[in-house]
Regions:
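Active-site-adjacent structural elements that line small-molecule/cofactor binding pockets in enzymes
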Residues: 1-295
Length: 295
């Protein structure tokens, strides 16, 4: 088992201690440091800062939102950071949700699984540099079709100018639903589950065969050292209430749906209802201790 440190993203105030955290994690033998993004700090920039001050620890996004960048941009950022860090970068990606992608980035959420598969395919092609990149997927065609709206009709297939340090930069996929989880096992080097319960493997419909050698499951496990169990669970419950209650629309929240599949449907709906009605403290207290402790 490898240990990683999840730094996440900025919340109400910028967190400026990421370098000291990374250095301590590296000195303690941690394998990796992970950043995330929502609609505050981005996932890549903090890793550049960390990479300049460390030498061994892996630098990983967990996750970078697919709707925020084109596949080519993701490939360029991954290649650049991997090269500058001496081959330490891991690209963790995920679809996020329609509320953020359409409300913040102004992009259609569309068919997320198909879009994810096309994105991974394009990134692989770009990094391999076998030939100028083309893609005929319905969601992310390359070049942009000449007959598409607002097209100038001048796009042509291009190939990455420079040779990457590693053409096989590992890709991890953040996934909660069975189809997306299956895609992670089929196309990626690792799976990033947001909530994972080892006692409920049937929830995730994990494959029993054809798993890639060295495939990794990078699970977030929140640790809070304290004397009181209820106090220790409170921080976890606050995070869960935010995601289950507010990180998605009332009609479609992937985190709420996952909690429901884990046997907490009424509790999940109650948390969401309280959170969206402005009763955030009540939403936190509505998260069952058993659920918070399980994951």
């Amino acid at each position: 088992m490898k240990l990683g440190a999840q730094y996440g993203y900025w919340t109400r105030e910028p967190k400026l201690d990421i370098v000291s955290v990374a250095l301590e994690a590296e000195n303690l033998g941690y394998d990796s440091l992970w950043t995330g993004e929502s609609y505050s700090s981005d996932a890549f920039t903090p890793l550049c800062w960390v990479g300049a001050h460390t030498s061994k620890i892996k630098l990983a996004t967990g996750i970078a939102q697919l709707g925020a960048r084109t596949p080519a941009t993701l490939a360029m950022q991954a290649m650049t950071l991997d090269t500058l860090s001496g081959g330490r970068f891991c690209l963790g990606i995920g679809v996020s949700g329609p509320q953020v992608i359409e409300g913040w980035h102004g992009q259609p959420f569309g068919k997320p699984i198909a879009r994810t598969k096309e994105t991974i395919n394009i990134i692989r092609k770009i990094l391999l540099r076998d030939e100028p990149v083309t893609a005929d997927g319905p969601n992310l065609p390359l070049p942009y079709p000449k007959d598409a709206p607002n097209s100038w009709g001048l796009g042509k297939p291009l190939k990455l100018i420079n040779k990457p340090l590693r053409p096989d930069i590992p890709i991890y996929l953040g996934a909660e639903g069975p189809k997306n989880i299956a895609l992670a096992f089929e196309e990626c080097e690792g799976w990033l589950p947001l909530y994972y319960s080892p006692s409920r493997p049937e929830i995730y419909q994990l494959p029993h065969s054809k798993v890639k050698e060295n495939f990794e499951i990078a699970v977030n496990v929140n640790v809070n050292i304290c004397d009181n169990i209820s106090e220790g669970l409170f921080m976890q419950k606050a995070i869960l209430a935010f995601y289950i209650g507010g990180m998605g629309a009332q009609k479609r929240n992937f985190h709420t749906e996952l909690m429901a599949r884990m046997g907490y449907e009424s509790e999940a709906n109650n948390i969401q209802s309280l959170f969206l009605s402005g009763k955030r403290d009540e939403a936190i207290h509505a998260v069952p201790d058993s659920f918070a402790d399980e994951i």
